[in-house]
Amino acid sequence: MDRETFHSCSSLVKLPRQIHQQHCSSHFIEYIEREIPYSKFFKNYLIPNQPCMFSKKFTEEWNCRKKWVTAEGKPNLQRLLHEFDETPVPVANCSVKEYNANPKQIMPFKEFIQYWRESIQNGHSSPKGCLYLKDWHMQRNFPEHNIYKTPIYFSSDWLNEYWDTIEVDDYRFVYMGPKGSWTPFHADVFRSYSWSANICGRKKWLLYPPGQEDFLRDCHGNLAYDVTAPILQDKGLYAQFEEACQPLEIIQEAGEIIFVPSGWHHQVYNLEDTISINHNWLNGCNLDIMWQFLQDELSSVQREIEEWRDTMDTWHQHCQVIMKSCTGIDYAEFASFLKTIANNRISFLNSSPRNADSCQDLLAESLCALGPHHAAFDLQRVLHIFEIMLNNEDFKRLDPATLSFKPEDLLQEIREAIRTIV
C-alpha cells in the first residue's frame, strides 16, 4: 500500500456504510482480466465491499490446476485418489435438509471418489443422494503439497493469521462435488470476505447485497434455505419476498476466482463436476462488519434468555458462553484476536530493515509485501474498533480475568507505532 492510498482510505473506512442499491438493478460484476495494482483492488473492491471476478490467468500456474485436472478439463480422480486415499474428509448430503443445512459425515477420501465415479457413470445420479465434499482443511493437513498460492489481493488475512497463531483452526477449504451439488443460502462465517477459485468445472452463484437477506426470512425470522424454492411465493410465510431485489447471477468458469464481499448472502451450484479452493478472510476493511455481527449475535442470545436475567448472577457471562458456542467466538476472544493482529504489526513496524529479504516466514513475507503503510492502516482500524468496544456496555461487563492484557496499554502502543509512519 502506498502513502496516498493509506491517507485516502483511512478517512473512507470511518464513513457510514452505504446500501448497495446499485447492485439491485445490475446483473454483472466487474471482471479483472490481468494483474492490477493492489491499491486499486483495495480502493475499488475491499473498501466499498464490492464483488468482482478474476480471470483464469491468476491461477494458471497453480500446481492443482496442473495435477488435479485431466487434459479434458475434468477432475483427475485417479491422481486425487493416489494423493489422498484413506484421508478422512467431511462430506455433505445435498439431498437432505437438516436444520436449514445439509447433514455431514466423515468418510475415507477413496470412498467419496468411488461414489463420484459411480455417480458420473449413472448420469450424475446415485441412491446415496447428492454428496459434496466440502469444508475440507486440505491445506492445513497437507501443507507440503503446495498446490496453490494465495493472490496478493487476498493476503491481508487476519482470520487465518490469528487461527494459525493459536494453532487451533483455519478457514482455508477445498470443495469437490459432482454436477448438481450445491450450497444452500447463507453468509460466510463472522460475515467475512471469501474468495473461491474454480480448479475445474463451473459454478453458478446467486449473490444478494447486504440487507436483502431480511426480505428472505420466513414469518419466524428464519433465513430461506433455497431462494429459488416455490415456497417463497407464499406470502403467509415469506411476507417480504417480493421486496427483495433479483440476485446477481454469476457463472464462474474453470480457473476463475470470485471475490465475495463481506455480508453478501449467496447460494451456489456446481453446473459440472467441480473442484474449488475457498478462503474465508477478513481485515481492517471489514472489521467493523464483524464487530457489528458479534453485537447482533449477542443481542440475539440475550433476547432468548431474557427471562433469567434477574435471577442469574452470571447472566451476562452465560450469554458470552452461549454466543461462543453458536458463533465460535466471544467478546474476550475477539479482543485477543485484535491484540494478536496489532502485536504482529507493531513488531513489523519496529523491525529493521522492513524488506522482503529479511522476512523469515509467511506472515512476515505478507506484511513486507503489503508494506508499512498497510500495517499502519491495520493498526488504525484495530484502534478504532477497540475504542468503540471500550465504550460498549457488554464489553465493560467482561470479567477482567478473561482478558490476558490491558486494552488501554495496547492502545497506547498502537498510537506510538502509528506515529512512526504517519
Swiss-Prot record:
Record EC number: 1.14.11.-
Lineage: superkingdom: Eukaryota
A GO molecular-function annotation: metal ion binding
Domain (JmjC) ranges: 139-298
InterPro entries on file: Cupin_8 (IPR041667), JmjC_dom (IPR003347), JMJD6_ArgDemeth/LysHydrox (IPR050910)
Alphabetical UniProt keywords: Cytoplasm, Dioxygenase, Iron, Metal-binding, Oxidoreductase
Subcellular location: Cytoplasm
Any single GO BP term: positive regulation of translational termination
Catalysis performed (reactions): L-lysyl-[protein] + 2-oxoglutarate + O2 = 4-hydroxy-L-lysyl-[protein] + succinate + CO2
Cellular component annotations (GO), alphabetically ordered: cytoplasm; nucleus
Binding positions (Fe cation): 186, 188, 266
Record SUPFAM superfamilies: Clavaminate synthase-like (SSF51197)
Co-factor requirement: Fe(2+)
Pfam family, one: Cupin_8
Biological role: Catalyzes the 2-oxoglutarate and iron-dependent C4-lysyl hydroxylation of ETF1 at 'Lys-63' thereby promoting the translational termination efficiency of ETF1.
Family under the similarity heading: Belongs to the JMJD6 family.
UniProt-recorded name of the protein: 2-oxoglutarate and iron-dependent oxygenase JMJD4
